[in-house]
Amino acid sequence: MEEYQIYLEIDGSCQENFLYPLSFQEYIYGLAYGHDLNRKVSILVENVDSDKKYSLLIVKRLITRMYQQNHLLLFANDSKKNLFLGYNKNFYSQIISDAFAVIVEIPFSRQFISSLEDAETIKSFNNLRSIHSIFSFFEDKFTYLNFVSDVRIPYPIHLEILVQTXXXXXXXXPFFHLLRLFLYEYSNWNTFITQKKRISTLSKSNPRFYIFLYNFYVCEHESIFLFLRKNSSHLRLNSFSLLFERIHFYAKLEHLVEVFAKDFSCTLAFFKDPMIHYVRYQGKSILASKNAPLLLNKWKYYLIYLWQCHFDVWSQEGTIRIKQLLSEHSFHFFWGGYISNVRLNFSVVRSQMLENSFPIEIGMKRLDTIVPIIPLIRSLAKAKFCNILGHPISKPVWTDSSDFDIIDRFLRICRNISHYYKGSSKKKGLYRIKYILRLSCIKTLARKHKSTVRAFLKRLDSEELLEEFLTEEEEILSLIFPRASSTLQSLYRDQIWYLDILFSHDLFNYE
């Protein structure tokens, strides 16, 4: 981020189009190739046939020839390797894709926005809220939570919709023209864009850039949904008796008479409280309501029309299924390399009146998030942070890095896990995962300095150095959309998903 700020200070007049020149900066491809903003990667200009080394000159030629008429010679699909040019096409395409990911994430990072003078100070969520929910869903208690709508986010998505959606948030026309060319050349990389089979946004074959595009697309979908939800209270109907003179409401009125024949003369109370609770996980999302299924049916058609009209994505009614939420239901989520287990608990509250001595029992349904300690330990064991029993071990492959980089990597993973699971009411499992990562970090540092853990702790003030493992973070590095000039856009642009959870490294590819 320091390199980006220095670049902007050199030429402040080009801040609107600063993304395009970054495409030709050497350190961008070094950062993208290393997948770590804290790692110093050298630019290698020899052995271009190797899959582990690359030439910056060839990367620049690829970008330049994308504008030329003969660029199809560079991206021919007849073989994996272009014998005429002598380099691996897919390898350099991967580098360009990762570089685009690094560049396009810059204007959406919290650190970059806070560095601008006119940036708006945005407070982070409190300690009792987790990051996988836009609205209060997991952490709140509801007296009546009866119906759940399981929504499958539609795909494939047209490439032009992706480019226009990303261009609307960051005004850098030259960069997005280059991005459009790149997407059309490599649209067959990702099943999310071209094929209609089950989406797998976190597959190892998917580049980091397409993960960003997918989350950005879902983010746009959720931001519009958030806008509709905020304004739905102005559209609610307190009584249908005021609508008798309107002809186009007769059909709805007749339908309601059939369903609610006995209560037709009364005010329909479920229109007064359009409470919708939302959470997204993997390629799906959930809408939950404590009202009758009629409200979810209305939102069902809202979303279908939204996808068809705004995103040009054809969606059928089967993509949204409404079902009744029972007490034995349990939800299992897997997103971003993390697993959540949400159970619906039924509790009874007993109260007693003072004057009249009789008990009153009120049943309440409560959703609690649970930290899945066993799957997390398996994930840590797979990433070589501990053994299968959960005993911390050192990370030998990281001993070549500096002490600061080693600690930063462990802290980043620990921070992301904390962001995801700290909404749970029971944090004992979360503290155990933090302990494993903390001790694994100490063992890795001791192994690097060829010392024992006890001797290393005596020589170094570990309490001051590693205190972040045990403290809750007050500020969250999140993805914030800048406020648009339009009043309409400012109504629904909110903090709705987090960028830092994508960089969980070894835990990211958990299966």
UniProtKB/Swiss-Prot annotation:
One of its GO terms (biological process) is tRNA processing. One of its GO terms (molecular function) is RNA binding. Its main location: plastid. GO terms for cellular component: chloroplast. It is found in: Plastid, Chloroplast. Keywords: Chloroplast, mRNA processing, Plastid, RNA-binding, tRNA processing. Pfam families: Intron_maturas2, MatK_N. Belongs to the intron maturase 2 family. MatK subfamily. Usually encoded in the trnK tRNA gene intron. Probably assists in splicing its own and other chloroplast group II introns. This is Maturase K. It comes from Adesmia lanata.
